[in-house]
UniProtKB/Swiss-Prot annotation:
It comes from Bovine herpesvirus 1.1 (strain P8-2) (BoHV-1). Keywords: Host cytoplasm, Host nucleus, Late protein, Transcription, Transcription regulation, Virion, Virion tegument. A motif (Nuclear localization signal) lies at residues 10-30. Interacts with US3 kinase. Interacts with UL31 and UL34; these interactions seem important for efficient virion nuclear egress. Interacts with UL41/VHS. The lineage of its organism: Viruses, Duplodnaviria, Heunggongvirae, Peploviricota, Herviviricetes. This is Tegument protein UL47.
Length: 742
């Protein structure tokens, strides 16, 4: 007892049962299961087991070597033959004084041989000698033959003989001047950035090497102006990743996704969905919070006119019946439009496009999965005809891919009834309005949804100004507006050609058995989309020739129509380029889900662009604003290329002639009780709206240098002369047997 503690006993520290049992055991001496396993592995490593040779690889007792052993030795490339003991005067004379300098693949000297006439130290000769040594009935002889063909194609690639043995293949630059009258689509120059490798199945593991010169080109130091789209796309991609990881649990597909009919009987559904995982994209439920956020993002986006646009609704937007006062208000302020006419144009545009589609979808309770399957089936229908995809089923009868003309157009008459899905006629006949379906955009993941929303809003605003400012019965186009619309028609056609061609190649790349073939270098390389619009040097030069023109700059100064179409072009150009770059980035790591989403996003934008060219092509008629002896003009070859492009895009959108568009518009105006009036409105209806200038305008493309020495655009020609070969663009009658002529 301690007196200081008032007689209370001292509390000692409690000891564990382990310490009581083993009082002298150190805690550090305890070993876990992992330590025990490591110790066992270390003991096994100290006693390595001697590898015994296989009995079938043993050398026969009466021979010094075994021929079977040599065969497998050559296949593995482990031959111990020397490479410097063959001293023939012929080979020594060909070596020259600089023998040994540089890469061994750059010399033209024959391969060095091993002593005693052995095989050269290269895989090709080793495979050939192995094939010679094997009997015809050997089970693996066919495997060696296929491997030898692959090695031969890799070691001896085709080159341009006129430019030297080390010169790369020269790529043809494309001109947008069109082709001679009466020659058809077959005489059109080849697409830009494409050489003789359109059907090249050689493996190309580094596709950016062919475009390395673009990084060294000082004229492309800044690359294509993507403005704020890159940052927005990066933020959307990060947000979607976080949502998938922490917010939304993975769900099973809502419905069973069928195989497109164009591929039935040619590929198993499991194999198709492994390459194009549409079932993974169909997992988003219709009432998901992401759909609500997508709808809110559309409603909160700014517009050039400042009004809220009704996109996906079964209710007509508000408007005033009566006179529709088309034409710009006269005054000192530029870029004005009547507010009454703008709201009437919203109702007119809604009825012409998205209104009928939205009501049909709502009435039939159609899920967005059908629209997704429609896009995939129609885009894959053309690509399924490529030799890259059908080579597995038709070995030995491989025909060359279309390396000339407009890509898709080279085989457009081969498949017109492609991949039928329910309501396909409705989707094709809505002027590309699928892009305004919020649930469909959400299915395409974050970045494609953002790009589709951006491009769709730009094209919608441009059409609104076109319908609000002009009418065929009261056109009133000024000279500046006619020139600007002609320039935009040329640029939009060139952009649509490039987008459709990309869809053609990207679909074959997704579905084909050779994803690393040189033929798909265009869609796999990342450098072109970092430096050029849509990865096209021809489109870059066409933009430079158009935007830097003094007449075009004068039109931008005062015309609201020229400004809003410029913003629409920049929006489509930026969104499409970003999606193509996304596809190339995901193709490098073979992320097929994101590749499919980017592919369908480009298809959605291309469908909307082709549908928007119909009202924009009102310029093609003599009724579109002739004042006195003046007549609209258009670039030579533009209408011919547009006609060819309309045939190529038949699976996605149904082309509409001018007469058909006028009749549909006039019928809708009668239903809405609207009447076009060329005079200014009376007092009380004279409220005007001014176009809000944006940083995403066509002026951001000013000040660049062309890449080619020759112009890519043709001269301006009379619209009547250009329509001489294509009267079906106005009347819709007289479809011809050749591509682009009806």
């Amino acid at each position: 007892m301690d007196a200081a503690r008032d007689g209370r006993p001292e509390r000692r520290p409690r000891r564990s049962g382990t310490y009581r049992t083993h009082p002298f055991q150190r805690p550090s001496a305890r070993r876990s299961l992992l330590d025990a396993l490591r110790a066992a592995d270390a003991e096994a490593a100290e006693r390595p087991r001697v590898r015994r040779p296989r009995p079938d690889f043993q050398r026969p007792p009466d021979e010094d070597t075994s021929e079977d052993e040599n065969v497998y030795d050559y296949i593995d490339g482990d031959s111990s033959d020397s490479a410097d003991d063959y001293d023939s005067d012929y080979f020594t004379a060909n070596r020259g004084p600089n023998h040994g300098a540089g890469d061994a693949m750059d010399t033209d000297a024959p391969p060095e041989r091993a002593p005693e006439g052995g095989a050269p130290q290269d895989y090709l000769t080793a495979h050939l000698r192995a094939i010679e040594a094997l009997p015809e009935s050997a089970p693996h002889r066919s495997l060696l033959e296929r491997t030898a063909r692959t090695v031969y194609a890799h070691e001896f690639p085709p080159r341009d003989l006129s430019a030297g043995s080390r010169a790369p293949a020269q790529r043809a630059r494309r001109s947008l001047r069109g082709f001679p009258r009466g020659g058809g689509g077959g005489q059109e120059p080849g697409p830009d950035d494409e050489g003789d490798d359109a059907a090249d199945l050689r493996e190309d593991l580094v596709p950016d090497e062919a475009y390395a010169h673009l990084e060294r080109d000082e004229r492309l130091s800044e690359g294509p102006p993507l403005l704020n789209m890159e940052a927005a796309a990066a933020a959307a991609g990060e947000r979607s990743v976080v949502e998938e990881l922490f917010t939304y649990a993975p769900a099973q597909p809502q419905v069973e996704v069928p195989l497109p009919r164009i591929l039935e009987g040619r590929v198993r559904p499991s194999a198709f969905f492994a390459q194009m995982p549409l079932d993974a994209l169909c997992r988003t439920p219709p009432n998901d919070q992401r759909v609500v956020r997508e709808r809110r993002a559309w409603d909160m986006a700014g517009t050039p006119h400042g009004l809220l646009i009704t996109t996906w609704s079964t209710v007509d937007p508000e408007f005033s019946i009566g006179g529709m006062y088309v034409g710009a208000p006269e005054g000192t302020r530029p870029r004005l439009v009547w507010r009454r006419a703008m709201k009437q144009a919203m109702a007119l545009q809604y009825r012409l496009g998205v209104g009928g589609l939205c009501r049909a979808v709502d009435g039939a309770r159609m899920p967005p999965t059908e629209a997704l399957l429609f896009l995939a089936a129609r885009a894959a229908a053309r690509s399924a005809q490529l030799p890259f995809f059908v080579a597995a089923g038709a070995r030995g009868r491989r025909r060359a891919a279309p390396a000339r003309g407009g890509g898709w157009a080279a085989g457009s008459h081969a498949v017109h009834a492609t991949g039928r899905v329910p309501h396909a006629t409705l989707f094709r006949g809505s002027m590309g309005s699928l892009i305004y379906w919020h649930e469909l955009r959400v299915m395409l993941t974050a970045v494609p949804a953002l790009c589709a929303r951006y491009a769709g809003a730009g094209l919608q605003s441009a059409e609104l100004y076109l319908l609000a400012l002009r009418h065929s019965e009261a056109p009133g186009y000024t000279a500046n507006e006619r020139y600007a619309l002609s320039a935009y028609l040329t640029l939009f056609v060139a952009l649509a050609e490039r987008a459709v061609r990309w869809l053609y190649l990207a679909g074959a790349h997704l579905l084909g058995p050779h994803p690393t073939a040189a033929a798909f270098r265009e869609v796999r390389a990342k450098i072109p989309y970092e430096r050029l619009p849509l990865g096209s040097a021809t489109l870059h030069d066409a933009e430079v020739e158009t935007v830097d023109s003094a007449t075009f700059q004068e039109a931008l100064a005062f015309s609201a129509l020229a400004h809003v179409y410029g913003e629409a072009y920049v929006a489509v150009r930026t969104a499409t380029t970003l999606l193509m770059a996304e596809y190339a980035a995901h193709a490098e790591r073979r992320d097929v889900r994101e590749m499919t989403a980017a592919f369908l996003g480009v298809g959605l934008i291309a469908q909307r662009l082709m549908g928007s060219l119909e009202p924009a092509a009102e310029l093609r008629s003599r009724r579109s604003g002739v004042r006195g002896p003046a007549c609209p003009t258009v670039r030579e070859g533009t209408l011919a290329r547009y006609s060819l492009l309309a045939d190529a895009a038949l699976p996605l959108v149904r082309p509409v002639s001018l007469v058909e568009f006028w009749e549909a518009r006039d019928g809708v105006m009668r239903e809405l009780r609207l009447r076009p009036v060329a005079s200014p409105p009376l007092a009380g209806k004279r409220r005007v709206m001014e176009l809000y200038l944006s940083l995403d305008s066509i002026e951001a493309l000013v000040g660049r240098e062309p890449l080619g020495s020759r112009p890519v655009l043709g001269p301006l020609v009379d619209i009547a002369e250009a329509l001489a070969d294509h009267p079906h663009l106005v009347t819709g009658d007289g479809r011809g047997p050749r591509l682009g002529g009806r």
